[in-house]
C-alpha cells in the first residue's frame, strides 16, 4: 500500500513539474511574440500612414484620377500603392525615384506615366501589360535600356526619353507601335536613327538633336507622315537626297552639324516651311544673299538662295 502511495506521489509531482515547465515555456513564447506583434502593428500603422499620404496626392482633373508627387522623397514606391490601382495618370517629378515597380502591371487603366526628372535606371518588362497607356515620359532620368515589351503598349501615342545620356538603341519590336505620333530621343548617345522608327506608320514628330548621328539612312523617306524632324547638334556631314521624298515634312532643323552643302532636291520640298542650317560649315559665302533676319536663322529663304547660288556657281565653273 505504501508503495502504491509513493508511486502516486511521484506521478503527481511529475505532472506538477511538467505543468510548471509548460507554463514557463508558454510565458517565454508569449514574451517572444509580443515584440513581433508590436513590429507587425508598427508595419500596419506605417503602411496605413503611407497610403494616407498617397491618397492625399490623388486628385480629379478632366474626369481622370491623377497621382501627383513633386519634390518629395520617394526613391522607391511602396507596395500599398496597388490599393490605388484605379489611378489613370502618374505624375511623379523630382522625387529621386530609382525604379519603376513591377506591380505597375496592375494599373491596367493607366493612360499617362510621367516620371520625368528622377533617377530611373530601367523600364521593367511588365510595362507591356499597359495596353491602354498613351504617354510614357521618362526624360531627365538614367535609362540605358528599353525592353522590347514596350512594343506591346499598343495605345502609345507619345514617347519621351530625352536626356538619359547613355541610351543608344531601341528594340525593333517598337515598330509595332502603330499609334505612336511623337518621339523625343534628344540628348542621348544614338549613333544612328533606330530602324524601328522608320517603320512606325503614324510618326509625325521626331527629335534626335544632341546625339552622335554621323549620317542619315537612305530610306529615311519611309517616315511618310513625318512633319517635324529635329537633328540639331549632331555630327552630320551630308543630307541624303531621299529626304526630298518626305512630302509632309514642314520643319527640318539641322543647325550645329558639319554640313558643307544643301541638297538641291530640297528646293522642291513645297511643304517645308521652317528649316535651320545655322552653325554649319557651308561652302558658299552668302553675305549679301539674304536679309539680316534670314541670315541669322539660315531658314527657308537662305536655303533656296544657297541652292540657286550653288547651281549658278557650278554652271559658271562648267563654262
Task: Identify the function of each model-found stretch.
Residues 215, 226-251:
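A contiguous binding-surface segment within folded domains or other stable secondary-structure elements
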